[in-house]
Amino acid sequence: LWHAVWPRMRPGDFRVNSADGVGADWPLDYAELAPFYARVERQFGVSGLAGDPNFPAEIDFPLPPLPLGDGGWRVARAQARLGWHWWPHPCAIHSAPYDGRHACVQRGTCQQGCNEGAKASTDLTHWPKAIAAGARLVTGARVRRLETDAKGRGIGATWLDADGHGHFEPARVTVLAANA
């Protein structure tokens, strides 16, 4: 289920082996990825509150945070009494009108679908713009393999359509999103 919770990895998450001797360090660091986090947060219209001391100070979300509501405030007060740090989590749900879509009306039906279009998803944020720019959306397809040239560079993808027929789609750039 897509809850629209919008986490960022922290700088230390990229170097767990160096810091803690477990796992593997990433081949890139937070600073390299940060501009892309910000870009996608703008594309989706993320609501959040800047200033969380667990994250770098430069984070600034395109929309203010969603209201916590009575239950959220109850949890926040309980955590504060225990001395725990709490912060409203960023969400890809619009707290105000954004990019032609409406704000959340706090109906609480997020999992059944958002009639206002306030809960961001690629069918609202990216597909319409890509199709308007000439992209073709193929549904019911499954990529079998990313194809490479003799030097190992991606040249396209072999995929199956809904009827099981194989196709090859050449591409200048290939991306393995891995359900991202």
Language-model-derived ranges and their functions:
Residues 2-5, 13-143:
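Conserved redox-cofactor binding core of oxidoreductases
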Residues 176-180:
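Flavin (primarily FAD) binding-site architecture
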Residues 145-169, 174:
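Conserved beta-strand-loop-beta-strand element in the redox core of flavoprotein oxidoreductases
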